[in-house]
Amino acid sequence: LYLYGPLDQGWWPDGLLTPPSYEAMVYDLQVMKDLGMNMVRKHIKVENDLWFDWCNRNGLVVWQDMPSGCGGGLIGSLDYGMQNFYRENEEIIDATRHHPSIGAWVVWNESWGQYPELGMAHTRRGVNSVIQANHDPGRFVHAVTGWVDVEMGDFLDVHSYPAPNAASNPVNERIASCGEFGGINLFIDGHMWAGSDVNYTTVDDADTYVNLYDRYTDRLQELQKE
């Protein structure tokens, strides 16, 4: 099975993490299906049951992120943040495991909350907290998406910007995954939101945007064959 879909942060211009309506929420999901996508990675957020229910009924596989542990002492000491992360992993899985659309649990994103400078014990414990809570061999555990891999879980994942890529893993033959790519900016007057911009690559018009996106999707097909 070849999975293809977006990293979906579930942010809204006015409600932030809260969608303005059910119709607006599922519109995004329907567009994914209309574009030929068969999965969505829910990034650093846990959605409501209605969102999952739509995915259940319409055949959209969900990769569910564990919201990353904090840094900078925002909710207490470093140790408290770590312990809270392990606990929340179990609670998130317990609260959502009944949704058949969830195909994988994603533990870590780009070393957020991993604290690699402290060694890999915390990273491995975080992965193990998800493995132990999973209780379902039919669901994958995606230990680390991007950056600091620890040879655990079912995936070997890279983040490749702007063009997609993937890595082979002859050691234990984990699933090759390009967890993130793209980041194409096209600035349109009247559709901009104030704030800093993440700039991987920028184009000046819609035709260039579409052509570049086509090149990236062609590259994905090459990776699939490899």
Predicted segments with their positions:
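N-terminal carbohydrate-binding accessory modules
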Residues: 1-33, 53
